[in-house]
UniProtKB/Swiss-Prot annotation:
ATP binds at residues 170-225. This is D-alanine--D-alanine ligase. Residues 140-349 form the ATP-grasp domain. Keywords: ATP-binding, Cell shape, Cell wall biogenesis/degradation, Cytoplasm, Ligase, Magnesium, Manganese, Metal-binding, Nucleotide-binding, Peptidoglycan synthesis. GO terms for biological process: cell wall organization; peptidoglycan biosynthetic process; regulation of cell shape. The gene is ddl. One of its GO terms (cellular component) is cytosol. Cell wall formation. Belongs to the D-alanine--D-alanine ligase family. GO terms for molecular function: ATP binding; D-alanine-D-alanine ligase activity; metal ion binding. Its main location: cytoplasm. Mg(2+) 1 binds at residues 303, 316. It comes from the Bacteria.
């Protein structure tokens, strides 16, 4: 039987470029372990260009990236408006895209728009699901409207931020808040703030990443929980995982970028999280509800905060969960008796299924007729 060709895309121009490479390595190995697919790899360099497959294989093997990119760029006609994606065409046809691009391009809907334009199946959520979920402010608005508990927040831009002094923030949200760039992932552009000086610095930092910034209340005694969700119309939810860092209960520690991807030796992981049956049921249901409200398909990770009274708050969704050796998403499915090879096989099947469903939808239009719309000279 002819193997289906899977285009594994990784890298990108976000601050999570290197994380994407590590996730892609594990996805590559998992896809290969199924013995069902031919894998074609495409790295997206930090300059936004898709690299040819041979160069991409070297980068996936963690060879020094910049010389590889420099050599590739010498072969590119940069005057061609489609030069950035020319490598896709030169690799021939493939059956499905498997994006592993964290942050910009991969999680904001950009790549999904390209896949839709090319009329090809892909793994994961549709463009609108990615775009909405990547915007933390818009996500919280949708969660709130649909009755899914989340933390209190304020959204500011560079102009309206002047109306929110630190004293006003404290009165509204409390004396510990998190300041976040609205459209970033993996704790990039996020600061924990406890005073006016930190608040000013945090706003300045977050506005480097986005023109929209979220200011969010801290949750007292918070435990951080993660839940994996996979599927389309009838999604599956994983066991719940928990992680704590030193001083997290007092509010002095939190699960930041360093703890996620650089050094997690101080992080305590717990799978399954030790929760009451009632809280476990509520968290899983909230995860499923959010998955549907945000129009997610294929895969997602839902992050929660559990307060000192064991009340869960949905933090944010991640529509393209990390799959590094440190990633809890990967471990959650292992614990749920779905190993890596089985997981990627299911994700690929979900991609084909969603594509087939969308093909049944009508995109036809009714002509208004020349006599109604007039002629153009």
């Amino acid at each position: 039987m002819t193997k289906k060709r899977v285009a594994l895309i990784f890298g990108g121009n976000s601050s999570e470029h290197d994380v994407s490479k590590r996730s892609a390595q594990n996805f590559y190995n998992a896809i290969e372990a199924t013995d069902k697919y031919e894998i074609i790899v495409f790295a997206i360099a930090q300059n936004g260009f898709f690299l040819d497959t041979e160069s991409s294989k070297k980068i996936l093997a963690l060879e020094d990236e910049q010389p590889i990119v420099d050599a590739f760029m010498k072969t590119v006609d940069t005057s061609d408006p489609l030069a950035r994606i020319h490598a896709l065409k030169s690799a021939g046809d493939f059956d499905i895209f498997f994006p592993v691009v964290h942050g910009n391009l991969g999680e904001d809907g950009t790549l999904q728009g390209l896949f839709k334009l090319l009329d090809k199946p892909y793994v994961g959520a549709p463009l609108r699901g990615h775009a909405v979920s990547f915007d933390k402010a818009l996500t919280k608005e949708l969660l709130t409207v649909n009755g899914i508990r989340n933390t209190k927040y304020i959204v500011v831009d560079p102009e309206s931020a002047n109306n929110w002094s630190w004293d006003k923030i404290v009165a509204e949200l409390g004396n510990i808040v998190f300041v976040k760039a609205a459209n970033q992932g993996s704790s990039v552009g996020i600061s924990r703030v406890t005073n006016a000086e930190e608040y000013t610095e945090a706003l300045s930092d977050s506005f480097q990443y986005d023109y929209k910034v979220l200011i969010e209340e801290a949750v007292n005694g918070a435990r951080e929980l993660e839940v994996g969700v996979i599927g389309n119309d009838q999604p599956l939810v994983s066991e719940i995982g928990a992680h704590t860092v030193p001083n997290q209960g007092s509010g002095d520690g939190w699960y930041d970028y360093n703890n996620k991807f650089v050094d997690n030796s101080a992080v305590h992981f717990e799978i399954p999280a030790q929760l009451s049956p009632e809280v476990t049921k509520e968290v899983k249901q909230m995860a499923l509800d959010a998955y549907k409200v945000l129009n997610l398909r294929g895969e997602a990770r839902m992050d929660f905060l559990l307060d000192e009274n064991n009340v869960p708050y949905l933090g944010e969704p991640n529509t393209l969960p990390g799959f590094t050796n440190m990633s809890l998403f990967k471990r959650l499915w292992d614990y749920s008796d779905i190993n890596n090879a089985k997981l990627v096989d299911m994700l690929i099947d979900y991609g084909f299924e969603d594509f087939a469903q969308n093909k049944k939808l009508s995109y036809s239009f009714v002509s208004l007729g020349e006599e109604k719309i007039g002629k153009f000279n």
